[in-house]
Amino acid sequence: MTYTLVLLRHGESEWNALNLFTGWVDVHLTDKGVAEGKRAGELLAEHGILPDIVYTSLLRRAISTANIALDAADRHWIPVVRDWRLNERHYGELQGKNKAQIRDKYGEEQFMLWRRSYDTPPPPIEAGNEYSQEGDARYAGIDIPKTECLLDVVNRMVPYWESTISKDLLAGKTVLIAAHGNSLRALVKHLDQISDEEIAGLNIPTGIPLRYELDENLRPVRPREYLDPEAAAAGAAAVASQGGK
């Protein structure tokens, strides 16, 4: 028996469109992002993938994408679980800043270290910064990070996968995870056993479902597959080029 998992990065957000580091800042989808969410749901339906449960973050761009996709797939009625551990990586002091300007100010090498290295976090966000999450009611009782690298995201995402999400898969449920570029990269790294060095080259496009078929050990039985490979390739290339505009 195989188990079906679908990963979905949220549709384009307002800050994606502005080329800003977003992280834990709670921004809306653009009209394009809404359309991407709808198309994602249509792709699920076209491929006969019927999610039984959805996991998403506490950020509206992922929650909205999940809701739009489920509505388009006529699965709006299934359970939705929201958890902060699926949040995007916290970009620290970079949150709200333009990627191209950061690259120009600090140079390509430092920019790429902060953006794509496995274990180098950006500078921590300062108390009182308008893009800090201190005092946000949704994070009550949580030790809110001040910055994160991808390793930090792996360390919160993978235990949640193992303790919670995996149980639904092994119970025979088709699981949809609607989350963010880095929380999904963390999970893909775990599932496909990608090295710390190679993960830097993995870019996940917005709004295109990525399907896994997993065995009883929750290891892939075949390579991961985007439901729209051509659009995914173009989208991944666009993500890779961020900072260059």
From Swiss-Prot:
<feature type="active site" description="Tele-phosphohistidine intermediate">
    <location>
        <position position="10"/>
    </location>
</feature>
<feature type="binding site">
    <location>
        <begin position="181"/>
        <end position="182"/>
    </location>
    <ligand>
        <name>substrate</name>
    </ligand>
</feature>
<keyword id="KW-0324">Glycolysis</keyword>
<keyword id="KW-0413">Isomerase</keyword>
<dbReference type="InterPro" id="IPR001345">
    <property type="entry name" value="PG/BPGM_mutase_AS"/>
</dbReference>
<feature type="site" description="Transition state stabilizer">
    <location>
        <position position="180"/>
    </location>
</feature>
<feature type="binding site">
    <location>
        <begin position="9"/>
        <end position="16"/>
    </location>
    <ligand>
        <name>substrate</name>
    </ligand>
</feature>
<comment type="pathway">
    <text>Carbohydrate degradation; glycolysis; pyruvate from D-glyceraldehyde 3-phosphate: step 3/5.</text>
</comment>
<feature type="binding site">
    <location>
        <begin position="115"/>
        <end position="116"/>
    </location>
    <ligand>
        <name>substrate</name>
    </ligand>
</feature>
<feature type="binding site">
    <location>
        <position position="61"/>
    </location>
    <ligand>
        <name>substrate</name>
    </ligand>
</feature>
<dbReference type="GO" id="GO:0004619">
    <property type="term" value="F:phosphoglycerate mutase activity"/>
</dbReference>
<dbReference type="Pfam" id="PF00300">
    <property type="entry name" value="His_Phos_1"/>
</dbReference>
<feature type="active site" description="Proton donor/acceptor">
    <location>
        <position position="88"/>
    </location>
</feature>
<comment type="similarity">
    <text>Belongs to the phosphoglycerate mutase family. BPG-dependent PGAM subfamily.</text>
</comment>
<dbReference type="GO" id="GO:0006096">
    <property type="term" value="P:glycolytic process"/>
</dbReference>
<dbReference type="InterPro" id="IPR029033">
    <property type="entry name" value="His_PPase_superfam"/>
</dbReference>
<feature type="binding site">
    <location>
        <begin position="88"/>
        <end position="91"/>
    </location>
    <ligand>
        <name>substrate</name>
    </ligand>
</feature>
<dbReference type="GO" id="GO:0006094">
    <property type="term" value="P:gluconeogenesis"/>
</dbReference>
<dbReference type="InterPro" id="IPR005952">
    <property type="entry name" value="Phosphogly_mut1"/>
</dbReference>
<protein>
    <recommendedName>
        <fullName>2,3-bisphosphoglycerate-dependent phosphoglycerate mutase</fullName>
        <ecNumber>5.4.2.11</ecNumber>
    </recommendedName>
</protein>
<feature type="binding site">
    <location>
        <position position="99"/>
    </location>
    <ligand>
        <name>substrate</name>
    </ligand>
</feature>
<dbReference type="InterPro" id="IPR013078">
    <property type="entry name" value="His_Pase_superF_clade-1"/>
</dbReference>
<comment type="function">
    <text>Catalyzes the interconversion of 2-phosphoglycerate and 3-phosphoglycerate.</text>
</comment>
<keyword id="KW-0312">Gluconeogenesis</keyword>
<feature type="binding site">
    <location>
        <begin position="22"/>
        <end position="23"/>
    </location>
    <ligand>
        <name>substrate</name>
    </ligand>
</feature>
